[in-house]
Amino acid sequence: VDIAILLHDHYDVKIDFEKDSAVLSADPRIVKEELEYIQCLSYNEAKLAGMFGMKILDPIAIKEIDDNNLDIPIVITEMVKPDGNVTMIKKNPPVLEHANPIKIVTGKRNCAMVRMESTASSHLVASLQLDRQYHDFVKLSPYVIDDTEMTRLLFLDADYVRRHERYIRAYYPQTEIVYGRGVVTLIGDEMWRVPKIASTASSTVSEHDLNILNLDAQEETSRILIVVEDKGTSVADAVRAIHSTRTKIHGLK
């Protein structure tokens, strides 16, 4: 990626990664049925997929292209069938008319939830991103308790939180940290067009006797997060459950 950025001004550059498979709608190690090859992804979708458990590309690689305000096509080629399935990743890919707006359903285990006062959380976030160059977390919707606005930060690596608990608590002594969390994520820039998508996804998880601890759906983020307890096969079960209704949800459009 770094070489492509350097050569971009002088050449028509394209990055081609050869992998075992082009991008699928879920991890084939978890989901065995109704998997779909994804023809196009935006930088945003690919970055989210990498953050939340899909091994497509390192999100930092896409961030570097974005930070340089470039649009370099990235192609994921299936190694065993180079003339077969490919996935094109671009800043603004074409919107395919009949494509499922839920492009990817993915899961991530070993997460941690950090709750603290919102002003303190903004200082922590700034320090993590600017001083430590750490971005492996997401800020969820705030809530108010006893006239105080609180913020939840979902860290996607609980081990990082364990190692830096003291640093995190320094910003707010009453910080609450909860381990043993997993997250299932629906990803797609066009999901906002589908009515009742969040409620349908959450009811699907509930029907499989999985307890939803938190749900965060924001139109601007191209993602729906469903936080569950990371216990046994709960995360994988939730991914399979939601992916199995992906076609049904598409039909709501």
Q: How would you name each of these model-derived features?
A:
Residues 1-253:
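C-terminal catalytic "cap/lid" subdomain
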